[in-house]
């Protein structure tokens, strides 16, 4: 079976290519970074497609499945950039699937759609506000999901995966920011770090996406994916820095004040059309200050998903790699 992976040169994409090829799939890796595409070709014997999502709709490639992992995933930026990447890009992928008579499209979305100014536990896939306008990323990912549902209704079998808090070797977002903060100003600790969160080893997300390709469950469904190990934020930090071999440094801050400050900052940035990410955003405050855990029962039943790497194993693997690189 032949799978096209969009965004293959990104963090998740590399692990996804490895997961598919190690399980016997023929893979075409799509992306714009030709150097990384060449590395994927050399390391995993994949086909490569060097193009942007703007151009993909016109491509004619005989593939059985598409996993759409490409997205503009950040908390700040220009509306048109988010729209072009996450909405228009998704429509272009849908058009590619129709042109090439693809059997199934697996779309990578985000559990950021669940974010609210309150603790939320055991969230099921349907428990989200489809009018969530916290940031452009969430708005455009919701719009992309609407396109996926429409395509499914029109005859293209589609599945949506919402993976939470990906981390692993090669991560440039979650853990590197925590490590940097710990070594400089200290890690912001809101609500004493008692908020319970789900984070996910990227290897487990790649597994879930392969299972979504293989599953014979009804199309049109959405699945949460996590490690299935809800944990207090402070406990995750303590385990991480024990493995790294550093003392954890905290900066205790009040949630309410930070939310107010972040709202003001965002307002100023919007007023003056500043597109560089603010030092603090509402999304960051809500993520660090409130509990959010996801229910993955549906993925376990329909996809037969069971995480293959525990949270502790993933943290140790990341910490060992960080220490090895810093010694060199």
Specify the residue positions occupied by each region the protein language model found:
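Conserved Rossmann-fold NAD(P)-dependent oxidoreductase catalytic core, especially the SDR/UDP-sugar
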Residues: 92-136
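Substrate-positioning beta->alpha
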Residues: 143-144, 171-177, 190-213, 220-221
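Amphipathic terminal alpha-helices
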Residues: 294-302, 306-328
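NAD(P)H-binding glycine-rich loop region in Rossmannoid oxidoreductase-like domains
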Residues: 49-88, 96-99, 116
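Conserved C-terminal active-site "lid" loop/helix of NAD(P)H-dependent oxidoreductases
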Residues: 202, 261-270, 274-304
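Mid/C-terminal beta-alpha module of Rossmann-like enzyme folds, strongest
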Residues: 211, 215-278, 312, 316-319
């Amino acid at each position: 079976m032949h799978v096209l992976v969009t965004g293959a040169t990104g963090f998740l994409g590399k692990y996804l290519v490895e997961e598919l090829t190690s399980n016997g799939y023929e893979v075409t890796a799509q992306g714009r970074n030709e150097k990384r595409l060449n590395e994927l070709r050399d390391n995993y014997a994949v086909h490569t497609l060097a193009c942007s999502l703007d151009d993909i709709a016109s491509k004619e490639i005989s593939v059985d499945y598409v996993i759409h992992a490409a997205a503009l995933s950040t908390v700040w930026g220009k509306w048109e950039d988010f729209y072009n990447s996450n909405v228009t890009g998704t429509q272009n992928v849908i058009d590619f699937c129709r042109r090439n008579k693809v059997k199934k499209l697996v779309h990578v979305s985000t559990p950021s759609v669940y974010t609210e100014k309150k603790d939320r536990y055991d969230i099921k896939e349907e428990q989200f506000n489809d009018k969530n306008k916290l940031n452009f990323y969430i708005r455009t990912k919701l719009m992309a999901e609407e396109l996926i549902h429409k395509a499914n209704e029109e005859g293209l079998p589609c599945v949506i995966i919402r993976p939470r808090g990906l981390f692993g070797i090669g991560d440039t977002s979650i853990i590197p920011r925590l490590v940097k903060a710990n070594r400089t100003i200290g890690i912001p600790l809101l609500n004493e770090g008692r908020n319970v969160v789900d984070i996910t080893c990227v290897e487990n997300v790649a597994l879930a996406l392969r299972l979504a390709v293989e599953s014979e469950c009804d199309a049109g469904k959405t699945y949460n994916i996590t490690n299935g190990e809800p944990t207090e934020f402070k406990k995750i930090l303590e385990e991480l820095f024990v493995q790294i071999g550093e003392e954890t440094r905290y900066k205790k801050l009040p949630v309410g004040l930070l939310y107010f400050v972040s709202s003001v900052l965002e307002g100023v940035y919007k007023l003056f059309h500043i597109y560089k990410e603010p030092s603090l955003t509402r999304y960051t405050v809500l993520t660090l200050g409130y509990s959010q855990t996801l229910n993955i029962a549906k993925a376990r039943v329909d996809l037969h998903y069971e995480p293959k790497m525990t949270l502790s194993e993933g943290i140790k693997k990341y910490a060992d790699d960080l220490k090895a690189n810093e010694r060199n």
